[in-house]
């Protein structure tokens, strides 16, 4: 099955053809997660909902480094496709497979061993702490399978194939939902049932991804008899992926700090914020889809030396992400009470969820500015600068806000203001960095190796 030709012809329809299945994959995954949370909220209780929801920033903190490396793998293989270097593509695919396995087992060890200390340090409400720890430990037992799917999808997306990862995710998501209903409604399990169903679904997605890659054409075929780590390709992946991953980790640290402050408002605030966060994920996945398009399209065209196409890709991804994300932001924010009641019948959580959706979700489209700009720079092999700027503009500001502003200007609604403020600051800095780099590059790529 061929992917999208990123080097020739009109770009808009090809970017949409690439991005929409990618967005559908993430949205579908979040939809299944939302079903899990809705089942927990309605049939187990608001404390269980808070236990599952409070783990979101912790999971992000632990997996973001490796997700960044998968982004580096995508960029490296895409660049090699642009350079038509099939030998190095084959070495890169083998390297990605090994990195996926190592990453998965490392995450299992980290997640299971650090669950209690991290959640305790976050001031997780005592009534939900044990449930949150149990959920997190079971969830991370499935990390090796999750990483196999993530890195396998990165290989396919580097050549423009975003449809088959969607099909795999659909099958695994259906299995996840059915198992979740079975464990919670039939076997009367709590958060552990949701976590077990997720791990089983991850195992299914890993099996399907490996089966697919084993049947790919050379140089993208996964060959178990020739698995090895190519030092050159690994270093290139790490050069792009580690700064992006560290950015994501620091980003998650700032979210953990904000979550810790949310926890001080009580279980209802945690549950309401967690319910609202689901809709932020839906909108963010739209941005992520165009991020993926920007990295793959720009990396291939940069590798081929087509700088004018690089510029066109950037603007198409930027404008499209703002339009699609902004539309979803508006729909969710305007009908926030209705959407929040999908996740819980408790009226006590609604005011907190509405506040978050009006002050955070409604302005999420601003984040497109730095997300697309950073992805464009990473597609051209420049990952450190956008990572540093994002750390300063987003993460540092959020921590200063929590520790310096909130004590003298308390309130849940004032805490939420830190999100749009940090997006504006980071957007200005990262867009400026992209413009400066492109002026320096002119019409010739800089140091493509």
Question: PLM features: what roles do these ranges have?
Answer:
Residues 1-19, 77-142, 175, 186-242, ...:
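Short alpha-helical transmembrane segments in multi-pass integral membrane proteins
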Residues 8, 12-31, 35, 58-65, ...:
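Residue-level signal for short hydrophobic patches within transmembrane helices
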Residues 34-37, 109, 117, 151-155, ...:
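Alpha-helical transmembrane segments of multipass membrane proteins
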Residues 46-57, 132, 136, 195, ...:
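Small-residue hotspots at the loop-to-helix junctions and early N-terminal turns
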Residues 70, 139-157, 168-176, 194-209, ...:
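Short runs within selected transmembrane alpha-helices of multi-pass transporters and secretion channels
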